[in-house]
Amino acid sequence: MFPKNGSKVPEIRFAGFSGEWEQRKLGDVFKYEQPQRYIVNSTEYDDSYDVPVLTAGKSFILGYTNETIGVKNASPESPVLIFDDFTTSSHCVEFPFKVKSSAMKILTLNRESDNIHCAFNVLQNIGYVPVNHERHWISIFSEFNVLMPKTSDEQERIGSFFKKIENLINLQQRKAEKLKQFKQSMLHNMFV
């Protein structure tokens, strides 16, 4: 689905698309925002609160806050990426949120014609593994050359494809979590 090293044309492609992809720096694909104005004041989280507090790491949602000032207003119509500046992990966010720390960048697209879900998968496809505990976006990631489809139609098709797969994965993970909770409940009720 993405061109291999040295090639500008992917081996697997949706029907109706042809031609080379264009090489761009990630810093030209994305602009970044420092998250300081969205940092949560209190770490007294409660699941009954409305605003999720995010980290770009594996845990993603740390909890929920009742703070309503300084909320980043992402939405399905205006999604953003959060990029952990130290681990380089990232997530696509389509809902309002606050953040835990300044150790991330909030990424948005430079071009309105680009598709954020396609660009997110390009970012996810970078095979970089951090070796030092240092910030990575400005000095390293923004300088990476990546290949992007030239047309917004192809970007949309790729982004939509991977978003559907991600939605299915999330659905299955929620089902698995409910089954684990059911199992724990049954074990507790049967053996206590």
Language-model regions: role of each:
Residues 21, 25-26, 53-54, 72, ...:
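Non-catalytic beta-sheet/beta-sandwich ligand-binding modules that flank or precede catalytic cores
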Residues 28-31, 71, 76-82, 106, ...:
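C-terminal accessory/regulatory regions appended to core domains
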Residues 55-121, 128-142:
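A short beta-sheet element
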Residues 15, 44-46, 136-140, 180:
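Short amphipathic alpha-helical segments embedded in low-complexity Lys/Glu-rich regions
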Residues 17, 104-110, 128-129, 139-156, ...:
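Proline-centric
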Residues 10-12, 102-105, 140-144, 165-167:
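Short amphipathic alpha-helical segments
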Residues 13-37, 48-58:
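Non-catalytic DNA-recognition/assembly elements of restriction-modification systems
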Residues 1-28, 148-192:
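Amphipathic alpha-helical coiled-coil/heptad-repeat segments
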